[in-house]
Amino acid sequence: MSETLNTPPTYAWVLKAFSSKLAGTVTKPVTKMSSYIEDAESDAELPQDAKEDLRPTETLTPLKSKAAQNGILKTPGTLQIKKTVNFKDISKDAATWNRPTKNNFLFTRLDDENPLMGHEEFKSPLLQSTPKPNINNPDNENKSKHDEFDNRYNININESYKNETKSNQRLGEDVPSKKKYPHSMDAEISKFKWDSNNNNDWSSLMKDCFRDVVNNNRKMKEIIKDVMIDTSQAFPSESLDEPDYTINLDAPRSSSGKYWKQKFSMLDSAHSDLELELTSIRERLESLILEKQEEINFWKQRCRALETEKIHNHQGQQSKYKGKEFVGNRFSQMRELYTAKPSPITTKVVSRPSQSDVREPQEQVPSKNLHRGADMSHLAAQMLTHSSKKSHTTNLIPSEGIISSTPISAASKVRMNLMQSNQTPTPAPFSIAAKKSHLPSKLSFPQDGGSLSSATTLQQLPKARVTPNVLSSLSSNLGKTNPTSVYQSKANVTTSADVEKPQVKVATSSRVDYDLKSPNQRTANAKKRLEERRRRRKLKLQELQLNS
């Protein structure tokens, strides 16, 4: 490992810097230190400028072994060189004072190239107040040097210090006119340490210099403040007197206040947008509720009208056929067929049934409780189709957008109840026993006074007991219109003595087929139709989107 460097302390470097700047730079030291020690009162020449010579000497270069010199952490070529720092002296001769762009202590001179260099009125106040040193009189050099500092910085030495120097001169103490400092650093530090007068002198100068620097800084701050106030008149909110904190959020001053004001304004705008959207949704829901309520009222009125119509029809038929054989509205043609004249028929038919087999229907007074009657679930299917068409029209409104489904309302509950129920509140025209015996709801008859058309066959007759009169009338009518149909009817009729009731196919209408279906089957068919309509609607929407 290499030896540690003998580094001087910090205060030694500061003292050396000030001493070399104010008093001059020492010459290159040599080995014989005692030969350069001079008397303080001897008239010696001023120290010359030190010449920069970086060549190492034998005394300054330490003797080290090759192992230390060839270390890994050593830079090759730097062990034989000692780097030094030289400070030049401020005291110059006449040639140096007139040298252009020469830096002196805390001030600069103008260049000789400036045409206004020779005029005193164009010089700076610092240069005008600075007198030139008297070069011809070397005894007054230090005095002129001190006067130069005093005049430049308005330095007044304390009266106590002056009186002390005068008293020392009266007592016969030797006051050196010229101060010479030894060339070594240790001797220089010891000289400053033991010379109290010199220390007081330079300490007072340093204090005054620092005081002037502080005053200049204060003046500079005031100037900057005045400039800022002048420039901030156009922007009164950014002046220096106003505080930077925010009291009112509506008029923020700080950056954080402006930031939070922007955030709160964004929240307010979002809140207002949400309120507008909520009001629009409420209006749409109210309109939908009104539409559904109108639909409910419409179907209620329709049901009431049908009930009243049924009641009036039933009461009118009872008053018309009172005291006679009861014939309903559907069986008017049956009565005419019974009363028609018979015609001869070649085929063997079953004899006419006795009067006891044909039961006379009992008259029934409409009961007050109107909760039993024929099946009217077809109204539920009509309601479903009506509501599906209406929802289809509402779903395709361009301004409102596509509505997926309506909420469960009173109308939907009414429709479900109608679909699940088997009977609606309509009056019963006759008893259940008579209905079972006659089975009149499965009959269908021609409308023109009992006469059949040419296309009608016996297969289209309802399942009922056929009398000879009925068969004769049918054969006579068929013979007049189309003779081929007569043979077809003869062939279709079974003539067996064992069978009393001929098997004839029933011609049922669409309404009768609808009544014969179960409620679950009707509900399933309605659901299928709804799904089919929805599928077609989706396809149309997709086509519209592709075209757009």
Swiss-Prot record:
One matching Pfam family: Cut12
Assigned GO CC terms: cytoplasm; inner plaque of mitotic spindle pole body; meiotic spindle pole body; microtubule cytoskeleton; mitotic spindle pole body; nucleus
Domain of life: Eukaryota
Segments forming a coiled coil: 261-312, 522-548
Biased composition regions of type Polar residues, renumbered to the chain: 126-139, 344-356
Localization of this protein: Cytoplasm, Cytoskeleton, Microtubule organizing center, Spindle pole body
Record bears the keyword Cell division: yes
Composition bias, Basic and acidic residues: 140-151, 161-182
Span list, region Disordered: 123-182, 344-369, 510-548
Keywords from the named record: Cell cycle, Cell division, Coiled coil, Cytoplasm, Cytoskeleton, Mitosis
Any one GO BP annotation for this protein: G2/M transition of mitotic cell cycle
Disulfide bonds: none
UniProt xrefs under InterPro entries: Cut12
Region (Interaction with plo1): 122-325
Molecular function terms, GO-annotated: protein kinase activator activity; signaling adaptor activity
Subunit and partners: Self-associates. Interacts with plo1.
Role: Required for bipolar spindle formation. May act as a regulator of the p34cdc2/cyclin B kinase. Required for full activation of the plo1 kinase. However, in cut12.1 cells at restrictive temperature the H1 kinase does rise concomitant with entry into mitosis, indicating that cut12 is not required for activation of p34cdc2/cyclin B. The cut12.s11 allele may promote cdc2-independent phosphorylation of SPB proteins thereby overcoming the requirement for cdc25 in cell cycle progression.
Protein name: Spindle pole body-associated protein cut12
Protein's gene: cut12
